[in-house]
């Protein structure tokens, strides 16, 4: 049996029956580099352990949970095998002449993986100082809020915005383990690892220029992100 509605009835139905709404989940926010600099400066002088975590996050694009994991489980001399390329390697690989290291994290059985943690030599020294510490990430976030600092979750976002200015996006995705956006074959993995090693010093240079510099007043650029 078919039912026919008059135009008047159809119009009434459209008015009184709620329609299903779809909303694009884009949450723009402003991140001031001044806030990044002030946060790092405050932590450097008041909480060096959290300062080390923040540096890990901004230098490698790590999530707080992964930065905490790296600090707790830091085993630089351990030898591991990278599944994609069947290569045995020390967890910690340093390029002293280029001023950086990468540490194999190898967190994979998660929706939020973390393959490598790239960091400067200076951050490595901080990491060594606090290695083995078990930190509650909620405590870090509460500390940041209490002292008016940039929340930890924003450091990865700042890292991404700065990194893609000087590094090809595919390589930046590899460094930050954004594998949901990047499909890697066995051969390509080794290529990306090599490219990441070549490009990463450019990112550290950009960080030193915009973030680690003491000239806070010059770093007022705003970054809008929906990552």
Model-predicted regions and their roles:
Residues 33-64, 156:
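Basic, Lys/Arg- and aromatic-enriched nucleic-acid-binding interface segment
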Residues 133-183:
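Short, basic (Lys/Arg/His-rich) helix/loop patches that form interaction surfaces
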Residues 69-121:
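Conserved tyrosine-mediated DNA breakage-rejoining catalytic core shared by Y-recombinases
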Residues 53-54, 65-70, 172:
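Alpha-helix N-cap/helix-start motif at helix boundaries, enriched for small hydrophobics
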Residues 1-17, 61-65:
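N-terminal DNA-binding recognition helix of tyrosine site-specific recombinases/integrases
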Residues 176-223:
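Catalytic-site neighborhood detector that most strongly recognizes the C-terminal catalytic loop/helix
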Residues 17-38, 98-99, 110-122, 132-135:
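DNA breakage-rejoining catalytic core of tyrosine-based enzymes
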């Amino acid at each position: 049996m078919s039912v026919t509605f008059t135009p008047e009835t159809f119009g009434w139905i459209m008015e009184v029956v709620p329609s299903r709404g779809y909303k694009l989940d884009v949450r723009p926010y402003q991140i001031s580099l001044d806030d990044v600099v002030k946060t790092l400066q405050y932590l450097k002088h008041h909480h060096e352990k959290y300062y080390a975590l923040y540096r890990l996050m901004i230098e490698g694009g790590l999530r707080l949970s992964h930065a905490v994991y790296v600090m707790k489980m830091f085993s630089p001399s351990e030898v591991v095998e990278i599944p994609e390329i069947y290569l045995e390697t020390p967890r910690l690989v340093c390029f002293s002449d280029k001023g950086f290291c990468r540490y194999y994290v190898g967190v994979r059985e998660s929706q939020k993986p973390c393959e490598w943690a790239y960091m400067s030599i200076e951050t490595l020294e901080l990491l060594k100082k606090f290695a083995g510490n078990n930190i509650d990430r909620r405590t870090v976030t509460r500390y940041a809020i209490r002292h008016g600092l940039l929340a930890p979750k924003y450091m990865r976002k700042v890292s991404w915005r700065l990194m893609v200015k000087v590094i090809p996006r595919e390589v930046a995705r590899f460094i930050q383990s954004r594998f949901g956006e990047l499909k890697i074959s066995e051969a390509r993995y080794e290529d990306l690892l090599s490219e990441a090693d070549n490009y990463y010093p450019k990112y550290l240079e950009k960080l030193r220029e915009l973030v680690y510099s003491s000239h806070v007043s010059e770093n007022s650029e705003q970054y809008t992100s929906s990552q």
